[in-house]
């Protein structure tokens, strides 16, 4: 690639990283990591419960603090970085959206299953009305062909989204698929509508897929310092920044500082270092929503069925985010079937 490109990188460690610590970030940890990212030059940082605004619940897990407390702790301390919040319609509400805007959130990302963009109309419309940088976020994008994904992206654009993301929530995609789908969005949306890519590292393709997305026209790329995130983590931001420097892609992030943030700040906060184990590898191989990993491990402990087997079955059933309750059902069903055949 010879053309000089400028992209906007978006750190997920304080939102997607919530999944890997059971949503238990303290306010002090939030402040420490966000200010370190800010000082490293990261321009956009996401802060909410792992499942977005309103995720603090029995179904998705109670966080150590409310979304408001996290946002109010982080936003006033930012020197150059802006803060985003994620909202999944059906989990987060318009009241949650207004609260985030009142706290000073700059960017709101409205996430839906890739076939259900129509449920985002109200939230995208309100976000634009409030003057926020408004992003449509199409999850589990491997489940739709490029033309279907473009149709859904156009809906989000028509509701007012100024950027639409193609989201590899399962870490399932390979670079050629990313290139094809990002190209379809870039060619099919208005020139002024930006395209973004969000990857997971379950098949170790996060960086390669993100590079493919940039080459295909993506302007925004998500990553997570030290890969802090669900499953085997998100695209490791410090690695992606290094690759961008090698390729002449401008991010505005200081490579040395972001390496230090990963090593000295993020890693000590992890319950265990993010890595590709057999269960997270299965997420990518079977195309399963990355945040299902800890739920599947708990189901394994409860029912004696290996998490890997549960995840494969969830993939075969084409489960999506929001169907966390099915994990226990599937595990119980498999346990009973094995007992009956014993």
UniProtKB/Swiss-Prot annotation:
The active site is at 19 (proton acceptor). Residues 7-259 form the Pyruvate carboxyltransferase domain. It holds the Pfam family HMGL-like. Keywords: Aromatic hydrocarbons catabolism, Lyase, Manganese, Metal-binding. Its EC number is 4.1.3.39. It comes from the Bacteria. Mn(2+) binds at residues 16, 198, 200. The keyword Ligase does not apply. Substrate binds at residues 15-16, 169, 198, 289. InterPro entries: 2-IPM_HCS-like, 4OH_2_O-val_aldolase, Aldolase_TIM, DmpG_comm, DRE_TIM_HOA, PYR_CT. Belongs to the 4-hydroxy-2-oxovalerate aldolase family. NCBIfam families: 4OH_2_O_val_ald, PRK08195.1. This is 4-hydroxy-2-oxovalerate aldolase. It comes from Alkalilimnicola ehrlichii (strain ATCC BAA-1101 / DSM 17681 / MLHE-1).
